Amino acid sequence: MLGKRAKAEKCDAIDGILEESESLLEDFGGTAAGDAAIIFSCQAVEHYEITRYGSMSAFADALGMDEAKAHLETILDQESAADSKLSELAEDTINDAAAEYDEDESEHA
């Protein structure tokens, strides 16, 4: 579309989210709290992506790059849908189970 090859670059922000996720799973892996940690870690990645794709779409719009903007908007919609599904999963099942885990742990402490 732009006549240039995409290049991979290391993203310190995503690396930080993944490191935090690993730490949480070391503490809570295999529990409902661990499941909640996985979901909110995935949501942190989704939110980062939503911010980036939203910004790129705005730049494409400002530059009059309609085809690029349309493509970026499609990706942005997919990222937003994934975030919504993760929220729904957390709210419908995982958060309550994680709260019960927390209460059980508090009683035994």
Q: Where are the regions a protein language model picked out?
A:
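Acidic, carboxylate-rich catalytic segments that either coordinate divalent cations
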Residues: 95-109
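Solvent-exposed, charged/polar functional surfaces in cytosolic regulatory/catalytic domains
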Residues: 1, 20-24, 78
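Conserved alpha-helical segments that form or flank metal/cofactor-binding pockets of metalloenzymes
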Residues: 1-17
